[in-house]
């Protein structure tokens, strides 16, 4: 194993909350032995900030951005790709879906857009509280049931069950497997030497393309148990029983 790639929310952290001291310390131990990479749906700035500028490489917006955070905590965007995005058309489509699904009550904006061309359908709106988001669809079953209709409404986009209460839209062909495979080609790393760590390999999850491609995968069901789930990657302390 040469490269360990990570999802963020639900894997290393709670949804949009800072990286804990324990998981940060564990990542530091892993970084002494492996190359580490974040593969995220959000942009590199958001990911690096949430991680407290932990030194790591980052693929943001499903691979549309590539950045590094230095040992001193400096974020450098090394590649950024953008595609045109019709905000009016996407917002109108989201509004149609809201009426169809009964999601007409929301706080903030009905849709969220990123400079890259990625977009988001935040079911509860852009200003919903974290508590509201976490309570909305904890097992993702509500959104999975609606996923075929949402995908049909956005044929030019990859559509995923994203975050705690949203649907992510990324311009085709950008998804986490596309991003990871491209990174590996550019850096001379075989996919057979990659371990991916994520929390949602199921239908519609944004980790699913990586899982379905056969990349070695460790599924995390509680970010607080990350060190326990990945302990096999580190040598036993001297004197430990086998």
Residue ranges with predicted function:
Residues 17-109:
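Active-site phosphate-binding/coordination module
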Residues 3-5, 57, 195:
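Hydrophobic "anchor" residues on beta-strands that sit immediately upstream
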Residues 187-191, 204-242:
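Asp-based, Mg2+/Mn2+-dependent phosphohydrolase catalytic module
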Residues 100, 105-195, 203-206, 213:
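Conserved acidic, metal-coordinating active-site core of Asp-based
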Residues 2-17, 180, 207:
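Asp-based phosphoryl-transfer active-site loop
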Residues 8, 16-18, 195-202:
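Conserved cytosolic headpiece of P-type ATPases
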């Amino acid at each position: 194993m040469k490269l360990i790639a990570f999802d963020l929310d639900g894997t290393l952290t709670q949804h949009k909350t800072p990286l804990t001291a324990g998981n940060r310390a564990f990542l530091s131990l892993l970084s002494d032995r492996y190359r580490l990479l974040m593969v995220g749906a959000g942009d590199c700035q958001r990911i690096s900030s949430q991680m407290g500028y932990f030194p790591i490489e980052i693929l943001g917006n499903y691979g549309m951005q590539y950045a590094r955070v230095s040992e001193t905590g400096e974020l450098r965007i090394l590649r950024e790709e953008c595609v045109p995005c019709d905000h009016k058309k996407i917002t109108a489509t989201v509004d149609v879906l809201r009426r169809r699904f009964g999601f007409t009550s929301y706080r903030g904006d009905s849709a969220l857009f990123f400079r890259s061309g990625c977009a988001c359908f935040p079911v509860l709106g852009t200003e919903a509280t974290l508590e509201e988001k976490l309570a909305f669809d904890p097992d993702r079953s509500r959104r999975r049931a609606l996923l075929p209709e949402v995908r049909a409404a956005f044929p030019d986009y990859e559509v995923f069950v994203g975050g705690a209460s949203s649907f992510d839209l990324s311009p085709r062909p950008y998804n986490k497997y596309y991003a990871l495979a491209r990174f590996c080609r550019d850096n001379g790393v075989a996919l057979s030497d990659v371990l991916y760590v994520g929390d949602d390999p199921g239908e519609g999850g944004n980790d699913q393309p990586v899982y379905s491609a056969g990349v070695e995968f460790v599924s995390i069901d509680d970010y607080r148990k990350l060190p326990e789930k990945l302990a096999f990657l580190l040598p036993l302390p001297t004197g430990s029983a086998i």
